[in-house]
Amino acid sequence: MKRLLFIGVIAVLSLGLVQAQRQPYRVVFDLTSRDSLDQKAVLRWLKEVGTASPQAQMEVVMYAKGFELVMPERSLLINEVKEAMKNPNVSFKVCAIALKNNNVYKSQLVAGVETVPDVIHELVSKQQDRWGYIKVMH
């Protein structure tokens, strides 16, 4: 009887371990800077994570001046942004409030970039959904 109970406990624990291993790799990058070092870093990380874990879901959330990364007229890295956007598991999202505060329109952003009404809500929601969080800074 004890042996059967022991086997049952091991089976349940093993099931939990399998579930833990199946957790998706999801990370949100918080970019607020127009600094090219920060922008290069986030683009490099997208590439490195995508190579190491092809199924990883990655999102770059931009506000303050970070959204300039996805503005063709202001970004020095626009080709790298477009390359990163070819990965279907990568998304770029910009805070609508930041755009409004800076008199920038969505039409000025690279096609495919999404806007979110409130970036703080986006970040908190992602964390509640168990996304990893990385603040991009140097």
Question: Which role fits each region the language model picked out?
Answer:
Residues 1-22:
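Bacterial Sec-dependent N-terminal signal peptides
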Residues 21-138:
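Secreted/extracellular ectodomain signature
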